């Protein structure tokens, strides 16, 4: 039995006692030997950055509330935790702190685990793992070698950001204004060998599978559909001539709009295209441009926003219908890694081509017009409005200036051109996807070594399974210039497993999305000899996955893809890894700053600022506590280090207790919306916790409650009991179906307020109060488990795991009302209310409504034409 000071709510004492009980009883360890229905709930695993932030707290509290609720409703619940421990931040910290990334990572895990435990999450810690340990990553190494043998993993050249000073590849976010974030060197585009997984082989299945994910937000599914980007079109061949008329390798371009083919006035190719490199050999000016374009962006987003640049190659492409020769241009908005690296340019009907043609004086031809223009302006084609109707797919279009295809609509033109090109061997129908194969190579040290050996005789050879894992050395000196494993000949040099000759290991490591793509399955069998064992099919797919919508595309796409790889390897039976997805909103907070001498801003933490607010809680002024001088108000933004507006969860737990922090994080906003951190709101939750504590102790201090006798209750007692059971019904629905935790808390608060006004000290009055207080403690248990654990004992129910106590169920008989309050309207306007017996007849209700004093006044001089009764709600008297 825990000991708690009677009338004083001491969060630290209460929470320590509850956590000791949970640890001693191994309360949240689960196995598969249960007759209960399973429920697998988890949040996206954290990166061990060193400390939790409020985004973590919100994320993990959401999943913990659902997990505890599901336990109380009779489910066998798995809620695990682990660490996404590889990645770039550890390398950056190693440089800054002059320590090995492994040492930094493991120290952070220890600290963050303690923080998570202080928040009282119902986690099965026996399943914990870190993805940087060999006993975890050996399984993805084994899977990769199997994918190599199946042809699903392959190596080819790809363009990356290269820092020539640090001699390393940079992620896009490490390139700032075209320079390396650390060295300041001008970043180059460099083509280097990279390993890829053939996610494109699964593109259609990934697309079709979205239709089965009814429990995923539509916004996430839409983003994935757009990212997969299925399109149907024609692949068309353009023969190519050099300036001397010699024939070169043909260009193949994919288009979804073959109806615009006669509008092609040039062909655009990527700077890395073989034809561009061929032309540059005899064109120094073009060679210089290609060298300049090496320093540009490599992502679609960057290419979309940068200024259009290009140059004629001197080559020409032969139009496949007209036979006309059109110039071939290098254009910086064409990606070599997308499609064929070549685009048929139709400046009359494509914005990027239009902008490029305008800049370089290239011809622009209209080949599509509206079949039925709505006004005189639409009858005339010009650059100011053609995009509006061309992109409006609901309008009927027809071809013009297109020879024998004039007058055809899109469908007719598509079929005619497809038939022609397929007959002549100049093209074919094709389904294309925007989705690209997943590049999994990273030129970094702190990651899972790619299990490949390079032999001059045998080529790239997968490491034999009996030689796995290829272990990453952890005790290294890390400077940030190059990779320690690349410069370590002892680690790098080995023998070829096929021929026994001298060979070298791959020194690239896996993209860290690899580790986070299968960890959900590993939790089901964390000590299994293989990647997973039969227990995976008991738990998978996970029932609820909680995480930010910013992961909608990359992580969640790779996550689904890797699960299908595991399915095809017969490791799991399910097609999808997760049935339901909840994407929680950001945690935002006020920002404050002062202008810096360098023209920037010095951001000041809200904890260091004294804030003035108006009656609506809006910030009206702020001064720095240290000097009493004003600071600028920056508005509310996502908590971040860059804006210095983060709040330390540990300090909040120390000040208010874990339950209060959990309560505020669930009350301040619905899960999908942004949560504005406001310490005044936390204070409000702390006051509620103290009131609840006092309510329970006051009740218990007045003596033991007798058994409830429903038949003996007075009207007032019935009303309180009805309120209790209405609250039970609402909170259960809010937890289980709606995940609307803020309204669940509000309902319990309303019940608490009603109970505070209920001063009936009779035996049955106290029995009703006992039932209400027990219900409140259980209803709040998923959110405030420590206080609920203590208050359940105070109410005389003994120390037990509340997750094993059934969640309250509303008593239907308690919800029946003896009397109803109806609104009285005259011609639709509210004029009063009446109380009627629940079994009152229509005639009785009509008479009471017309006799209601205020309604009677408005009826003077009028004739009642009819009376409309909405049962249980409204009486509307129509009079004139």
Curated annotation (Swiss-Prot):
Q: What does the UniProt entry say about where the protein is found?
A: Cytoplasm
EC code(s) of this entry: 6.1.1.4
Motif 'HIGH' region: which ranges? 46-56
Positions of short motif 'KMSKS' region: 638-642
Q: Name one GO biological process term.
A: leucyl-tRNA aminoacylation
Chief location: cytoplasm
Q: Which Gene Ontology terms cover its molecular function?
A: aminoacyl-tRNA deacylase activity; ATP binding; leucine-tRNA ligase activity
Cellular component GO terms, alphabetical = cytosol
- What does the UniProt keyword field contain? Aminoacyl-tRNA synthetase, ATP-binding, Cytoplasm, Ligase, Nucleotide-binding, Protein biosynthesis
Where ATP binds, per the record, is at: 641
Q: Which reaction does it catalyse?
A: tRNA(Leu) + L-leucine + ATP = L-leucyl-tRNA(Leu) + AMP + diphosphate
Q: What class of enzyme is it?
A: ligase
UniProt similarity note = Belongs to the class-I aminoacyl-tRNA synthetase family.
Protein name stated in the entry: Leucine--tRNA ligase
From what organism does this protein derive?
Answer: Xanthomonas axonopodis pv. citri (strain 306)
